[in-house]
Amino acid sequence: MTESSPLAPSTAPATRKLWLAAIKPPMYTVAVVPITVGSAVAYGLTGQWHGDVFTIFLLSAIAIIAWINLSNDVFDSDTGIDVRKAHSVVNLTGNRNLVFLISNFFLLAGVLGLMSMSWRAQDWTVLELIGVAIFLGYTYQGPPFRLGYLGLGELICLITFGPLAIAAAYYSQSQSFSWNLLTPSVFVGISTAIILFCSHFHQVEDDLAAGKKSPIVRLGTKLGSQVLTLSVVSLYLITAIGVLCHQAPWQTLLIIASLPWAVQLIRHVGQYHDQPEQVSNCKFIAVNLHFFSGMLMAAGYGWAGLG
């Protein structure tokens, strides 16, 4: 019996693919979008823009998302829900404790970045807001809470990446708050929650086995696909209502250019909702919708700020 080298041509590409899936590069848009949108809203409404603050905040947010992704892999390995997940970082390394240590390093790096930003401003409001967001992020999978297993992950996403992150990014630029944050906060919160919602369609069997009552486990895939459709449509309705009520500048209607991804997501999940293999990539379509709609909204506020 011959032992194949881990670097053999036949296995190396597969291993690289698994590592890419484990690291989840596309998922870091959930850090980029709220910080960019919140900062753009500050510029659009107040004319304030501090590039150094934006850069530190963005890098800190990316580090915190790395903590969330890695620690969630650790917590999922503890419950056994990821036992068949080849692209789990814990399964790839075989070292749960090392992954947990690295995840906490990223958390520390993110918090230190925010602390440096707050120290320079002599204002700890942003750190306090993100502290609440970090706590909520922990409750998603972390013991003893594990609220994601109760189907509350989407609500946590909506609050954390919507009102909390947008308000923190806005405040970091303007040192103030505004009721006009409502439209972009709800918009980004829902678009982020849609990504998590889509991640459940292909893993109903594993969720059931682990006792995880995800929204798709509770609703079923067909009703879940209909809820997804309403959620996607709501992104455009919320923006239109915000414009009509003078809560958002008309330039935010640029998000209409993201409709191709919205239509693709609705059609894809509508057709394959009960076919795990075919529907499994819907979360990446959701990531595209989240990223491009968010960047378009940020561009709209930037445009408004130019007068």
UniProtKB/Swiss-Prot annotation:
Q: In which pathway does it act?
A: Cofactor biosynthesis; phylloquinone biosynthesis
Q: Which Pfam families match?
A: UbiA (PF01040)
Q: Does the keyword Transmembrane apply?
A: yes
In the record, the note on similarity to other proteins reads: Belongs to the MenA family. Type 2 subfamily.
Q: Name one GO cellular component term.
A: plasma membrane
* Task of the protein: Involved in the synthesis of phylloquinone (vitamin K1). Catalyzes the transfer of a prenyl chain to 2-carboxy-1,4-naphthoquinone.
Mode of membrane association:
Multi-pass membrane protein
EC number(s)? 2.5.1.130
Its lineage opens with:
Bacteria, Bacillati, Cyanobacteriota, Cyanophyceae, Synechococcales
Q: Name one GO molecular function term.
A: prenyltransferase activity
Q: Which organism is it from?
A: Synechocystis sp. (strain ATCC 27184 / PCC 6803 / Kazusa)
Summary of the knockout phenotype: Mutants grow photoautotrophically under low light conditions, with doubling times twice that of the wild type, but they are unable to grow under high light conditions. Mutants contain less photosystem I (PSI) than the wild-type cells, and membranes do not contain detectable levels of phylloquinone.
- The highest taxon in the source lineage is Bacteria
Task: List this protein's GO terms for biological process.
Answer: menaquinone biosynthetic process; phylloquinone biosynthetic process; vitamin K biosynthetic process
Q: Name the catalysed reactions.
A: 2-carboxy-1,4-naphthoquinone + phytyl diphosphate + H(+) = demethylphylloquinone + CO2 + diphosphate
Q: Does the keyword Cell inner membrane apply?
A: yes
Its gene? menA
Q: What is this protein called?
A: 2-carboxy-1,4-naphthoquinone phytyltransferase
The record's subcellular location field reads: Cell inner membrane
* Keywords on record: Cell inner membrane, Cell membrane, Membrane, Transferase, Transmembrane, Transmembrane helix
Q: Which residues cross the membrane?
A: 27-47, 51-71, 98-118, 125-145, 147-167, 177-197, 223-243, 284-304
